[in-house]
Design a protein with these regions (language model features):
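Conserved N-terminal phosphate-binding loop of PLP-dependent enzymes in the Aspartate aminotransferase
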Residues: 1-89
């Protein structure tokens, strides 16, 4: 499931220039954004949709999903993030 999660985030990064890098191992994945404000917006708006994302190093998002996460949960998060990123271009 970790590879699936990372692949979905890489697909998101390829679609949105605000995402500079996706890195990690297993389910512990980080996403670096081009600006601090993008990270702040993603954290806040994702929380309102029910997804908790940790922000580190000002513009890096750290994902630490529970071990019981399912593909549908990952897909939901990526869909929410996609909509948010479209809105902040």
């Amino acid at each position: 499931l970790g590879r699936y999660f990372k692949r979905r985030l890489v697909e998101l990064a390829e679609k949105h220039p605000q995402v500079e890098d996706v890195r990690g191992l297993g389910l512990l994945v980080g996403m670096e954004l081009s600006e601090r404000r993008f990270a702040e917006i993603l954290v806040e708006m994702s929380r309102k949709e029910g997804y908790l994302i940790n922000r580190t190093a000002e513009k890096v998002l750290r994902f630490t999903p529970p071990l019981i996460v399912e593909k549908k949960d990952i897909d939901g998060l990526v869909e929410v993030m996609d909509k948010i990123l479209i809105g902040i271009t």
